């Protein structure tokens, strides 16, 4: 007996997608927190922010999760995490093995569970969206949201005006280029210069990225490798304890600043 599917009308597929997606865009036109970048620090921050009851939107320019996790170390499918971040791995249900002084996790499981736990906590993640600018106010000076564009439009070079999303806080978790802070520093008198990261010194990088995670200006925060770009810190390679701890720390700082 042939398998029978529900009748499918092609136009109804379009309606279902456009109507439900549009409803969510309207809902998230205003959020408590916008996290830019779905890498390790961004996903960690999103999970803990959402758990605190903050309306949290994650925007990722690519069509995947995990930032630099997926490539492991030079395409070997493993990443290293320091024992100091063990509690976060356990909190996300990420399995690991012990290897000398480190914990070693599977890169695919690592990024999948970071994303799943962030979503389960209530964060909304939308792929294929780039942040090309910020919304600001000057009394007092601060960031109040972002200007967004489809990544495909950005890549194509077409001239298409962006749309705007307001938020009480924006977290730059875009990685090595600190893209949100970079554009804000160029266009707003933030007295911040993004000089970029230094060459590798893993121990110092991991420690100082966590120490310097936090607020750049009212409404704008740095997490993960964006911190290295802003503060000219060393890079660290495929070791992710600092990224996890930075994501958790920025969530705590944002929640405190928003009085939650």
From Swiss-Prot:
Q: Name the EC number(s).
A: 2.4.2.59
Q: Which UniProt keywords apply?
A: Iron, Metal-binding, NAD, Thiamine biosynthesis, Transferase
Question: What does the UniProt function comment say about this protein?
Answer: Involved in the biosynthesis of the thiazole moiety of thiamine. Catalyzes the conversion of NAD and glycine to adenosine diphosphate 5-(2-hydroxyethyl)-4-methylthiazole-2-carboxylate (ADT), an adenylated thiazole intermediate, using free sulfide as a source of sulfur.
A Pfam family for this UniProt protein?
A: Thi4
**Protein name, entry field:** Thiamine thiazole synthase
Metabolic or biological pathway, per its Swiss-Prot or TrEMBL entry:
Cofactor biosynthesis; thiamine diphosphate biosynthesis
As recorded in Swiss-Prot or TrEMBL, the protein's gene is named: thi4
Stored SUPFAM superfamilies: FAD/NAD(P)-binding domain
Look up keyword Transcription regulation and say if it applies: no
Keyword Iron assigned: yes
Q: How does it assemble?
A: Homooctamer; tetramer of dimers.
Where, by residue number, does NAD(+) bind?
41, 60-61, 68, 131, 159-161, 225
PANTHER family assigned to the protein according to its UniProt record, in alphabetical order: THIAMINE THIAZOLE SYNTHASE
Q: Which family does it belong to?
A: Belongs to the THI4 family.
Query: Which positions are annotated as binding glycine?
Result: 235
GO molecular function term, any single one = iron ion binding
Q: Which reaction does it catalyse?
A: hydrogen sulfide + glycine + NAD(+) = ADP-5-ethyl-4-methylthiazole-2-carboxylate + nicotinamide + 3 H2O + H(+)
- Using the UniProt record, name the top-level EC class of this enzyme in a single word: transferase
Q: Where does Fe cation bind?
A: 161, 176
- Cofactor(s) the protein needs: Fe(2+)
